[in-house]
Amino acid sequence: MTINCVWEHNGRDTLLYAVDFVGAYTRGETLEAAVRKMQAEICSYLKWCGKKAVTSMDIVIIEEKVSELAICDADSDVLFESEKAPLTAEEYIKLKALALKSAQDFLALYDSVPDKNATAAPERKTFYGQVPRTANEMYEHTKNVNTYYFAEIAVDADHDGNIYECRKRGFESLESNPDFLQNTVRKGSYGEDWSLRKVLRRF
């Protein structure tokens, strides 16, 4: 199987995205390190989707983005060329279902943690502040980006309630715009380009 990838890097650290497996990515200190992790990532992704794993794959870099961001902290601003194209209704329904499944599964994982304030991780500061260390901090951080991501594509959303509920409401707000499938590319915060396809990948 050929895995088409977008390579985002700052000359040191790498983020490698599998274009046709929306949301799948690896990170490494080098491109080679990220490539080595990709087969396990794709197999895990396919299992999560209820599909069969693959036994062999070829990694092909189809796009490169040189960045000045802190890639080692998963800071990213890339917009794939493929994320500029309009969506069909069928594509949107499929990608929305994945984004909602992700929220639902994340909530189930969070709910399964007995002590949501326990941590064994050391304190560490990144571009956005302290790294979330407890289950509660990780959950709140992930839930709270709902407002931010939707706002970047001019959609009014919130992060009230649980992560699934607020994400579902965000999509309902998006769908009130009759032209949302046009996938307009917008200049968001810090000069970063955003589209609906990018938001779906980031979720």
What role is predicted for each listed range?
Residues 1-203:
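Aromatic-glycine hotspot motif
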